[in-house]
């Protein structure tokens, strides 16, 4: 074998071994975190086993297991707008939950799509330049995902069964999502659960410049969006925080003021997880 080929072969072997080791470490992290959550919760025993074991090493809520799962005392709500209705939930996810969602999603990321108003199907578009994936129905039954979904249901007051599958997204530098509404303009998507009423957007990283969630019709001041000064309100990505906002007004009609976008990422990576909630059960 020629010396040049030996060098190339050696580099390929090194990279392959590194990828295998990385995957094994990632799998070990997922397994450890899953073990720490046990197999069920008091209100969800019909979905999993009968025995219940919760997060270890949480002494503050040693006598209140539901409070552990809901992170009562940790989550700090902040109302940033009443019209449209926007609430930032600080420390909504634990650091471990953020890493868990990223670990599940990373191997399955694909180019993100948007809903075609004519067909109701996902299509690629320059409106949205990220990569993402949806959790499966099987993954939805995992204890950690159950805990997150139960927390979303409690803080949003929308039943868990009305929620779509969680979507995990990654935005790299120069990627963005142009302003849009989460509610549907087509009739195809309304057949499964009706209209979208609310969104829970959860941030999984914060080592990013730019990438704010921008509401151009909220508030009457200025904000920062991808390094630019804009009219409206923006929320900076902070690991563990979540933004809860409603696409439907108190009158039961879709709220055009809920238009929002993902500002351009200037540096770093922005990871997020989104849960859309409907008027009725989605399955």
Curated annotation (Swiss-Prot):
Topological domains annotated Lumenal: 28-283
Protein's cellular compartments: Endoplasmic reticulum membrane
Binding sites annotated in the UniProt record for Fe cation: 180, 182, 260
A UniProt-annotated Pfam family: 2OG-FeII_Oxy_3
SMART domains per record: P4Hc
Result of changing residue 260 to A: Reduces activity more than 500-fold
Cofactor: how and how many bound: Binds 1 Fe(2+) ion per subunit.
EC number: 1.14.11.2
Domain Fe2OG dioxygenase: 162-279
Known cofactor(s): Fe(2+); L-ascorbate
Cytoplasmic topology ranges: 1-6
Binding site for 2-oxoglutarate: 270
Membrane topology term: Single-pass type II membrane protein
MF terms in GO: iron ion binding; L-ascorbic acid binding; procollagen-proline 4-dioxygenase activity
Consequence the record notes for mutating residue 180 to A: Reduces activity more than 500-fold
Keywords for this protein: Dioxygenase, Endoplasmic reticulum, Iron, Membrane, Metal-binding, Oxidoreductase, Signal-anchor, Transmembrane, Transmembrane helix
GO biological process entries: peptidyl-proline hydroxylation to 4-hydroxy-L-proline
Induction trigger: By hypoxia.
Catalytic reaction(s) noted: L-prolyl-[collagen] + 2-oxoglutarate + O2 = trans-4-hydroxy-L-prolyl-[collagen] + succinate + CO2
Purpose of the protein: Catalyzes the post-translational formation of 4-hydroxyproline in -Xaa-Pro-Gly- sequences in proline-rich peptide sequences of plant glycoproteins and other proteins. Hydroxylates preferentially prolines in second positions in the -Pro-Pro-Gly-triplets. Hydroxyprolines are important constituent of many plant cell wall glycoproteins such as extensins, hydroxyproline-rich glycoproteins, lectins and arabinogalactan proteins. Can hydroxylate collagen-like peptides and hypoxia-inducible transcription factor peptides.
Note: Plants over-expressing P4H1 show absence of trichome on leaf and petal surfaces, increased root hair and reduction in seed size.
Record-stated family: Belongs to the P4HA family.
Protein name: Prolyl 4-hydroxylase 1
Gene name per UniProt: P4H1
């Amino acid at each position: 074998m020629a010396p040049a080929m030996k060098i190339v072969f050696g580099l390929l072997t090194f990279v392959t071994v590194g990828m295998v080791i990385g995957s094994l470490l990632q799998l070990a992290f997922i397994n450890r975190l899953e073990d720490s959550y046990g197999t069920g919760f008091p209100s969800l025993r019909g979905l999993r086993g009968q025995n219940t074991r919760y997060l270890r090493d949480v002494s503050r809520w040693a006598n209140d297991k539901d409070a552990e799962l809901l992170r009562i005392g940790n989550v700090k709500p902040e109302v940033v707008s009443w019209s449209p209705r926007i609430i930032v939930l600080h420390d909504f996810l634990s650091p471990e939950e953020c890493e868990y969602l990223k670990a599940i999603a990373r191997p399955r990321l694909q180019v993100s799509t948007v809903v075609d108003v004519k067909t109701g199907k996902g299509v690629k578009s320059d409106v949205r330049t990220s990569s993402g994936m949806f959790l499966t129905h099987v993954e939805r039954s995992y204890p950690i995902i159950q805990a997150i979904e139960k927390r979303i249901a409690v803080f949003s007051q929308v039943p868990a069964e009305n929620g779509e599958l969680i979507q995990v997204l990654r935005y790299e530098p120069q990627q963005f999502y142009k302003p849009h509404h989460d509610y549907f303009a087509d009739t195809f998507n309304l057949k499964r659960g009706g209209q979208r009423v609310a969104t829970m957007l959860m941030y999984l990283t914060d080592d990013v410049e730019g990438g704010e969630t921008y509401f151009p019709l909220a508030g009457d001041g200025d904000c920062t969006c991808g390094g630019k000064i804009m009219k409206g309100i923006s929320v900076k990505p902070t690991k563990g925080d979540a933004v809860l906002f409603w696409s439907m007004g108190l009158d039961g009609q879709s709220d055009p003021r809920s238009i929002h976008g993902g500002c351009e990422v200037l540096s770093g990576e922005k990871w997020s997880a989104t849960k859309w909630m409907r008027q009725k059960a989605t399955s």
